[in-house]
């Protein structure tokens, strides 16, 4: 049974369609990276899953329970971290956490233990007596995570948790999320920091204009986005002749000679090849073609496609 599921989920604001028949499945223990341009529908989706917003049509489920009909049973299962933390700034950290623990009906010594545990998990124990308004942005975001962990939810819904954080705070947040994943939490996280999502998440969804363009593993999205290869080919000499040979191979879109700094302090030249192996031979055949034609290879590498590149290839940058 999926831990998070949406079925033809739609949200309208008057004439504006923020979500358009969104179908999403996230299994227990998954860390799902939700990617899309501003205005794509990420926050709307997360707010519906957090039971804070009613869908116009369609269905959303948490652990098999239907949002809108079983919210009372759903809320103990989820922890929602918005992109901006609303804090009672005149409280100290322990008061803040104890206040929310009481709201979850955690009382007495159990409350104190739970507060100590989440402070330790989020590495905020040394700030237990500090006022909330004295915390840095990164610490406040970790405090927001500590707050939603008080009742030990199965599902974490996180809307841009690293937004506005400096590099050190982002690293600390990433390590915290890795630990939560090791604990078996199901995590849905939206973020614009795509390299970190690629490292953290095992599943990714790309949304644009309220529609899900892709839903699958990071490896699958990289394969799907890789409509062509970018190859760096080095030969000892006869660059133009090698380039002309490659240009005649079916599937080669473009060949150019570019400068290459090999890292040894000497500037050389390489062939920059755009190649689509769906239209011709496999990319692994190209070295043999060159060698059999009398060229000596000094380099044959493929430019990696990362999550940022995949995102740019699969989206058009459109918003509602």
Regions found by a protein language model. Name each.
Residues 7, 234, 258, 301-303:
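Solvent-exposed beta-strand sheet faces enriched in polar/charged residues
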Residues 274-320:
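C-terminal coupling/interaction segments
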Residues 7, 56, 253-256, 298:
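A short, local hydrophobic-aromatic micro-motif
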Residues 28, 126, 235-237, 275-277, ...:
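Non-catalytic surface loops within mature trypsin-like serine protease
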Residues 10, 94, 194, 219, ...:
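Alpha-helix N-cap/helix-start and coil->helix boundary motif
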Residues 174-275:
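ABC transporter nucleotide-binding domain
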Residues 2-6, 11-209, 213-214:
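ABC transporter nucleotide-binding domains
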Residues 75, 119, 222, 287, ...:
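Conserved protein kinase catalytic domain
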């Amino acid at each position: 049974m999926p831990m998070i599921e949406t079925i033809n989920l739609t949200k309208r604001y008057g004439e504006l369609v923020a979500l358009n028949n969104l179908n999403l499945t996230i299994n227990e223990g998954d860390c799902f990276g939700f990617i899309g341009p501003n205005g794509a529908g990420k926050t709307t989706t997360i707010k519906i899953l957090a039971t804070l917003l009613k869908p116009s049509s369609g269905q959303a489920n948490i652990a098999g329970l239907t949002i809108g009909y079983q919210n009372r049973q759903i809320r103990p299962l989820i922890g929602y971290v918005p992109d901006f933390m609303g804090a009672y700034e005149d409280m100290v950290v322990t008061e803040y956490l104890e206040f929310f623990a009481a709201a979850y009906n955690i009382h007495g010594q159990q409350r104190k233990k739970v507060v100590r545990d989440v402070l330790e998990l989020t590495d905020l124990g040394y700030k237990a007596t500090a006022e909330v308004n004295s915390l840095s942005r990164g610490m406040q975001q970790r405090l927001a995570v500590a707050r939603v962990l008080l009742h030990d939810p199965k599902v974490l819904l996180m809307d841009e948790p690293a937004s506005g954080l400096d590099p050190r705070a982002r690293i600390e947040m990433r390590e915290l999320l890795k630990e939560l994943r090791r604990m078996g939490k199901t995590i849905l996280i939206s973020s614009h920091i795509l390299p970190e999502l690629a490292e953290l998440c095992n599943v990714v969804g790309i949304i644009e204009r309220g529609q899900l363009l892709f839903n699958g593993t990071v490896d699958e999205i990289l394969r799907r986005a890789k409509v062509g290869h970018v190859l760096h080919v080095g030969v000892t000499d006869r660059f133009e002749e090698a380039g002309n040979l490659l240009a005649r191979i079916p599937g080669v879109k473009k060949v150019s000679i570019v400068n290459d700094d090999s890292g040894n302090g000497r500037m050389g030249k390489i062939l920059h090849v755009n190649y689509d192996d769906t239209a011709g031979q496999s990319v692994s055949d190209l070295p043999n073609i060159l060698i059999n034609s009398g060229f000596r290879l000094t380099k044959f590498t493929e430019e990696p496609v990362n999550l940022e590149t995949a995102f740019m290839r699969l989206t058009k940058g459109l918003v509602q």
